[in-house]
Amino acid sequence: DITSDRGISSVAITYVNTDYGVGLADVYEAAAIARGIEVTAKTAHEGDKADYSAEVGVLSSAGGDALVVIGYLDQGGNQIIQGSLDTGAFDTFVLSDGMIGESLTDTFGSDLDGSFGSMPGSLGAGAMKFKAYAEANGVDPSVYVGESYDAAALIMLAMCKGGSDDSATVAANVMDVANGPGTKIYAGELKKGLELACAGFAVDYDGATDVNFTEVGEAFGAFLEKGIEGGKFTDVAQR
């Protein structure tokens, strides 16, 4: 959806040769074609090579309005972007969640202006509080940091509610502390939440990612559209 909304009509895709990369590349390709976007090439890259000129050459020959980079910053993604910029093959990049991080913009700066991607996240009250809380404590609130924080918090709250630290107790109580009803607990308020839960009061943990679970225990998720402007990542919209 984001690629289509940006007016891009053709893309080449490169993906890291792992289950993550293969699966996401297949899903992206199918979604792109369904929206009328031409996929000019789809090629894998290994995550531990010293030279990616061959991969960049194939992608450059195929062409496209943008290059979709599905992978990780430290496993070939940066090098493929560098090669694409150096050869003039591409100047707009569509980034998977594993490619979104401050190290990318620290390396390339405004050369990536106009590039974009998506990652799990929210623009809700909890997410904004977590971002401020993390930055105040010297933590980069990048991809999956909020989810990791919330997972640890939910385990501790479930232990408090159930009065035990065994896995069965956590499993039996985690839905209650995540979905409520009860006192809302946001990022940075874990101490308050633990005190309430351990004292027998009901809590509704929202945390950093506005946590809620379905009846079968799957997390409701939201995604952030991220753009690069002025050499920095910006939050464009919640999807």
Q: What role is predicted for each listed range?
A:
Residues D1-R239:
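Extracytosolic ligand-binding ectodomains
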